[in-house]
Amino acid sequence: MSNVNMDFEQAGELKIGQVGIATLRIRTLNVPRLIQEMSDRVTRAPKLFRRTAVILDFGELPHPPDLTTAKALVDGLRAANVLPVAIAYGTNEIDLLSQQLGLPLLSKFRAHYERQEVAAPPPQSTPPINTGRIQHTTVRSGQQLYAEHCDLTILNTVGAGAEVIADGNIHIYGTLRGRAMAGARGNAEMRIFCRDFQAELIAIAGRYKVLDDIPTELRGKAVQVWLEQNQIKIAALD
């Protein structure tokens, strides 16, 4: 079984969401580097990332950026054809920063961090994965198929520009030419299985790889995709 590992550290971790909005989690406040990383993503996969909506998450930084730095980041991302639409992580400082930048602060992130500051709630159990959903026909370009709280099995092709999403695993018995996202609610144990692998994008629990990141020797092969130590792994099943 061949196994491909392409690990590298980035200043910003981009996670793909369920509704076409990505979250850019800022790990290192290096504005030129962050802008260059996003510009590289747009260059490698313009159909996926050009003018994509992005939520900025400064929650991993010890301190939020000052207004000048944050504005330079927002302006630089826009120049790179990436569109910041909101800010995550709702501390009072971030709330003020969002007002100064004219970007909304997402209420769900505000509530999450305010609860953490008061008292950490008991961990919530992951909803059980129910009986899977089966798709018999081709998923065509522009279509999106979502299997909530269950696995998704596709007995046909996922066309280029199509998107299949599941909270559980994804099994594709035809060709995958579009995008496949398993573990959509954050379950990193989920996997993608595909008989003919030619994907535009694959993601598990928000971590992703695009076509240019996938070795050519795996294209057209039967593969499985999983997450290990927050890195996407791809292995041939032949």
UniProtKB/Swiss-Prot annotation:
GO terms for biological process: cell morphogenesis; division septum assembly; regulation of cell division; regulation of cell septum assembly. It holds the Pfam family MinC_N. SUPFAM superfamilies: Cell-division inhibitor MinC, C-terminal domain. Keywords: Cell cycle, Cell division, Septation. Disulfide bonds: none annotated. It comes from the Bacteria. Interacts with MinD and FtsZ. Belongs to the MinC family. Cell division inhibitor that blocks the formation of polar Z ring septums. Rapidly oscillates between the poles of the cell to destabilize FtsZ filaments that have formed before they mature into polar Z rings. Prevents FtsZ polymerization. This is Probable septum site-determining protein MinC. It comes from Xylella fastidiosa (strain M12). The lineage of its organism: Bacteria, Pseudomonadati, Pseudomonadota, Gammaproteobacteria, Lysobacterales.
